[in-house]
A protein has these predicted regions:
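Acidic, metal-coordinating catalytic segment for phosphate/diphosphate chemistry
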Residues: 2-37, 41-43
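Short loop segments at secondary-structure junctions
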Residues: 12, 42-45, 53, 124-128, ...
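Short acidic (Asp/Glu) patches
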Residues: 18-26, 63-64, 79-84
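A short, polar/proline- and glycine-enriched secondary-structure boundary/capping micro-motif
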Residues: 28-29, 58-63, 143-144
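A glycine-rich, hydrophobic loop/mini-helix early in the fold
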Residues: 35-69
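Nudix hydrolase/Nudix homology domain
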Residues: 100-108, 112-209
Length: 209
């Protein structure tokens, strides 16, 4: 497997420092790194969630539709290659809206702290889930979860709902889920995204994030 190199970012603006490292070393060193999240809003409205693979970050949890590290020299929409790699889909650039940036610090399954500068985008898609071709190593399954279920789950941690989707073999899957089944991101990230997705589905495109 080819080694991926990333830019080390520095505060206060979290711009590239000029230091480039292999991504694993940068994670181990506790450096701030740039990542992209693309959220795909579905009819309903609903959000497309991917199931995280074993190992690494939030294994087995619901996570953003698409995500990945910016490689050295990349910024903005450069990271959209992840959409095709993970979902087998070429997302039209003109359909994507920048939501904003936030900082995130989390602990992965190897007990490493990940210091992330997350650039968040959103788009809308209403074609069948079966159109996506999942990379089984990165995305075991995808789920289409109604925004209302996401909101209720995070406003009431005891609330359970059924999530439906397709696995990497395009076979139907379902699971009974609650807030604990989502990746943990400080600051109510999933709840905020759900509220934004509701507005996005109604046509709003300007957000204070």
């Amino acid at each position: 497997m080819a080694i991926e190199y990333v830019d080390v970012l520095v505060p206060p603006g979290f711009e590239p420092s000029g230091v480039v490292k292999p991504v694993v070393k940068a994670i181990n060193d506790g450096d701030w790194l740039g990542v992209m999240n693309l959220w795909i809003v579905r009819p309903g409205p609903a959000l497309l969630y991917q199931e995280r693979p074993p190992g690494g970050w939030a294994p087995g949890k619901f996570d953003g539709s698409v995500g990945g590290y910016y490689r050295a020299g990349e910024s903005g929409l450069d990271c959209l290659r992840e959409v095709e790699e993970e979902l087998g889909w070429k997302c039209p650039l003109e359909s994507i809206t920048l939501i904003g940036r936030h900082l995130s610090v989390g602990v992965d399954s190897m007990d490493r702290k990940r210091h992330l500068v997350v650039t968040v985008f959103m788009t809308y898609d209403d074609l069948p889930l079966s159109r996506f071709t999942l990379d089984p190593k990165e995305v075991p399954a995808i789920y289409e979860i109604p925004v209302d279920d996401v909101v209720e789950a995070f406003e009431n941690p005891q609330k359970k709902f059924k999530a439906y989707g397709l696995n990497c073999n395009r076979q139907p899957v379902e699971k009974v889920a609650c807030a604990d089944d989502f990746s943990y991101v400080f600051g109510g990230y999933h709840l905020r995204i759900a509220h934004i997705a509701r507005k996005f589905a109604s046509g709003e495109r300007a957000f204070y994030y």
